[in-house]
Amino acid sequence: MSVTLGTPLQSSAFKVLLLGSGELGKEVVISLQRLGVEVHAADRYDHAPAMQVAHFSYVLNMADPAQLKQLIEKVKPNLIVPEIEAIATEVLLEIEANKTATVIPSAKAVNLTMNREGIRRLAAEELGLPTSAYRFADTLESFRAACDDIGYPNFVKPVMSSSGKGQSRVKSFDEVDAAWEYAMQGGRVNQGTVIIESQIDFDFEITLLTVRAKNPETGEIETHYCDPIGHRQDAGDYVESWQPQPMTPAALEEAKRIANKVTTALGGCGIFGVELFIKGDKVWFSEVSPRPHDTGLVTLASQFQSEFELHARAILGLPVNTARHSVAASAVIYAGVDANNLSYSNLNVALAHPDTDLRLFGKPEGFKRRRMGVATARAENTDLARTLAKETADQVSVQTNS
């Protein structure tokens, strides 16, 4: 079956509506643009990164059903591609049921993964996948009881948050009330529910980028895997990542089994970021995102097709190639200040090494711990690549302007 794409801004245009316009969405837009797709980007604030490279952009509250429905009716997209969790998913379920547009990867996947409760119950209770022990709580009293039940130390996360917001490690009962307050401040869409997880004794954690794409000859959906990505987090937020992460053949096989099971249950086509804990040959499921993953920024330097190109190809029904050509690493560049209209200097020094690269996201406003860019590096092994990526990131100087 032939895949046909039209011409942007013409009546034949194939339209994609991106819901959420951050740095990951920006790379997806660029990948779609290269294939002649007309892209419409939406977010809650103007001049978001993906908006800067899209054909059209819109500012709205995507968690408001009326606003979201109005936008979809206006754009009339072929595909709706969510980049964030804070979306009125009931609208997407309705759109999919009416066959008005195709939701990527599926409305079910977006609805289930928009909060940690839905996906954890699917993974642990329906699919029987190994996870940490967990409880949910929606009041301070039930939270205190759940923390005591799980034991200490434990990890607390709002069921709806991203980039580590509202997450904390609770070492004793004395820290419980403060953790509750912090989680309430960090959650999105005022959900008011948290997950309490037991601490797993693991060697390392990985992201297994898993791609569901149609076989061009048979039309059947097949599952492909990128090499495992190792990563380091600080307070739940990605700081650096590298590919490949060495692991035993048995652990890799189990990781693929778990990733296949959860992504098959979610359905649809596209890339999924499956987060897993590894200890020896043992593997535990942690989380899944039905879209490109921040730790996957390393694939810009390591793979023939980055996670963004893989996502674009998969959702358009095109063949994918998950092969890696290099050992690589990525390191985050933070704003370091609370300011807008920032400048980035010393770039010539940062990029002096031929195996390094930068992505500066163009975010209009910076916060001390806001991710404003990423450095990537290739090297003979992951240790050297990590060192080079961090050196490159550290050499970028973020400056304020009056």
From Swiss-Prot:
It is an enzyme of class 6 (ligase). Pathway: Purine metabolism; IMP biosynthesis via de novo pathway; N(2)-formyl-N(1)-(5-phospho-D-ribosyl)glycinamide from N(1)-(5-phospho-D-ribosyl)glycinamide (formate route): step 1/1. N(1)-(5-phospho-beta-D-ribosyl)glycinamide binds at residues 23-24, 83, 294, 363, 370-371. ATP binds at residues 116, 157, 162-167, 197-200, 205. Residues 121-316 form the ATP-grasp domain. GO terms for cellular component: cytosol. GO terms for molecular function: ATP binding; magnesium ion binding; phosphoribosylglycinamide formyltransferase 2 activity; phosphoribosylglycinamide formyltransferase activity. Its EC number is 6.3.1.21. GO terms for biological process: 'de novo' IMP biosynthetic process. Mg(2+) binds at residues 275, 287. It comes from the Bacteria. InterPro entries: ATP-grasp (IPR011761), ATP-grasp_carboxylate-amine (IPR003135), ATP_grasp_subdomain_1 (IPR013815), PreATP-grasp_dom_sf (IPR016185), PurT (IPR005862), PurT/PurK_preATP-grasp (IPR054350), PurT_C (IPR048740), Rudment_hybrid_motif (IPR011054). Keywords: ATP-binding, Ligase, Magnesium, Metal-binding, Nucleotide-binding, Purine biosynthesis. It catalyses: N(1)-(5-phospho-beta-D-ribosyl)glycinamide + formate + ATP = N(2)-formyl-N(1)-(5-phospho-beta-D-ribosyl)glycinamide + ADP + phosphate + H(+). Belongs to the PurK/PurT family. Homodimer. PANTHER family: FORMATE-DEPENDENT PHOSPHORIBOSYLGLYCINAMIDE FORMYLTRANSFERASE. Involved in the de novo purine biosynthesis. Catalyzes the transfer of formate to 5-phospho-ribosyl-glycinamide (GAR), producing 5-phospho-ribosyl-N-formylglycinamide (FGAR). Formate is provided by PurU via hydrolysis of 10-formyl-tetrahydrofolate. This is Formate-dependent phosphoribosylglycinamide formyltransferase. The gene is purT.
